[in-house]
Amino acid sequence: MNDLIKPSSFEDELNTIISLFQGTSNNTEGCTPLVPSTIEERAKQRVHNEEILRQSNIEDVIKGAAERLAQDEGGIKTHPVNEDWLRQFKNNVQDISEKEMKLIWSKVLAGEMKQPRSFSIRTLHLLGKLSKEDADVITKIAPFTLSDDSGRRMIIHSDMDEDDFFKFDDLLFLNELGLIETSATLHMNWHFDKNVSDFSNCIKLNNGNVGININLNEKAYGIPVYTVTMIGNQIFSLIEEVIPRTDYYKRIIDKLYFKGKCVCGHIKDVGDDNGFVFSDSIFSIDKIA
């Protein structure tokens, strides 16, 4: 729709609101008259304009998904998508007008076509309720997350003041959305076959191409975390161009109690049970002594 003319009076503002409700704008040439003569005509006009806008929203998202799939190098084999899923997708996406949110929905559709069941119907319902401002909070927190080699996503925490990096209110907000669990008693636990003396028991964590190896000699170790839920994992995966906050990782891991060493760097190879292979080192922490 064309940009609205700024109202010069309350009457103009009222007419502008009415025109928005009907899907028209006062400065659109050739549009249907603002107030048709009968309620039946006004209802038909509103439904007509609303459905045109909805169809436009759906087609914008489909086009975005097609462009995303076309950009994948080497071509991508797509798979049939469940009809119930598609119906729920359409019902949610038809009322999405924000450009930034349309891009997110395009990524959802492309991801589901490449790998069905990547995004649950529950995730679609939650995503459909998110505003751009909500998405901005998720984007703000994404750089502080880490995933282990099984895909479990988390935010490590300790006694430090996290407000130096993010507001705890943001985490509480994501907790209310059902994306993370903020209970202070939660720990992520790792178990190894045996105690070792060479610190070869390794916890591997990463955020994109930034990885962390925490090498221990203990058979079991637990880290205090805020855990990301299944729906949270799916929604966080939609955030692109995340720049991991390695300054946070360094400070928070240095606060943890363990005997061993930690190295953070850019991942060159996923390596093996002994840790990632790095192309460089971003920071290291030695707690062997």
Where do the language-model regions lie?
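Extended, compositionally biased alpha-helical segments that mediate assembly or anchoring
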Residues: 7, 251-289
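Non-transmembrane, amphipathic alpha-helical segments
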Residues: 89-93, 122, 126, 159
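Short, amphipathic alpha-helical interaction segments positioned at domain boundaries
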Residues: 98, 190-252
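Short acidic, hydrophobic short linear motifs in intrinsically disordered regions
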Residues: 140-172
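Eukaryotic partner-binding/assembly regions in large regulatory complexes
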Residues: 3-115, 286
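Short alpha-helical segments that sit at the start of domains
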Residues: 102-145
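Short amphipathic alpha-helical interaction segments
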Residues: 81, 160-212
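Short, solvent-exposed secondary-structure capping/transition elements
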Residues: 117-118, 135, 139, 147-155, ...
